[in-house]
């Protein structure tokens, strides 16, 4: 697995994302990024669609980031992408 940097505007939010991120949560994520840095790459697929990391993506956009680190999970099937997202949102 390789971490790469891409322009934040190339990332696409997954339209089927069921997890809501209220503003207070985005604020907490922003505070964490400001204090500790951004060290948890966003997981995306081969089309740059977010699999996991919507909250971090929203926080980074609000903070004005133009490039972000991502991990491409091109090898996952659609079912595996869904399972991955669910598993990470339960943690």
Which residues make up each language-model segment?
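Short, charged/polar connector segments at secondary-structure boundaries
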Residues: 1-91
């Amino acid at each position: 697995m390789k971490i790469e940097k891409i322009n934040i505007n190339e990332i696409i939010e997954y339209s089927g994302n069921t997890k809501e991120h209220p503003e207070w949560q985005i604020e907490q994520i922003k505070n964490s990024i400001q204090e500790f840095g951004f060290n948890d790459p966003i997981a995306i697929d081969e089309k740059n669609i977010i699999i996991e990391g919507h909250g971090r993506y929203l926080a980074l956009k609000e903070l004005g980031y133009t490039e972000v680190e991502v991990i491409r999970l091109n090898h996952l099937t659609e079912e595996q992408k869904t399972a991955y997202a669910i598993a990470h949102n339960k943690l």
